[in-house]
Amino acid sequence: MEWTGAVYADAPTVEVSTWIDAPPERVWELASDIHAVAESSQELQRVEWADGDGPRLGARFTGYNRHPALGEWSTISEVVEFEPLTVFGWAVTDPANPTSSWRLSLAPEGSGTRLTQWMQLGPAPSGLSLAISATPDKEQKIVFVRLRELEAGMTATLDHLKQRAEH
């Protein structure tokens, strides 16, 4: 990731992508399973569905997180995009004004599937906002470091899903 000088109010984004040697049906089975997504995360420790046993538009889940600098916290997310074999997206805290938004999207590519994970910070304040408030002169660095952490975590998630889908 290259330095962009972004601040939190810019609602910066991160995107990672990988090609998986498996059909979209197999990749979707894993990408739409929030438990499988959490398995490889250093930060997202576990999830619990609040409204049933799986993803659907409007379903909610609680995510339990841990970060060495930010501590432990939980969030409630709502599924805001759900098109089988295509996209699974959720907004954290408030769908109308999320603290972050996440999306896993699939596209057939050759004999396999392109899986892309995207996320956006903000626009609503989050735990990161507290760190920025404490040292506002370092906001760009704080945002950049956080985006790099998220990029590394997302890459690990896609690598994990790829390995599971291909074996």
Predicted regions and their residues:
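Short, mixed-charge, low-aromatic patches
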Residues: 18, 34-35, 58-61, 113-120
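Glycine-rich portal/gate segments that line the openings of hydrophobic small-molecule binding cavities
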Residues: 48-101, 109-114, 152-160, 164-167
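Beta-strand/loop substructures that line and gate deep hydrophobic ligand-binding cavities in soluble
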Residues: 94-152, 161
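Hydrophobic ligand-binding cavity/cleft-lining segments
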Residues: 1-57
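Short amphipathic alpha-helical segments with heptad-repeat character
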Residues: 21-24, 28, 144, 148-151, ...
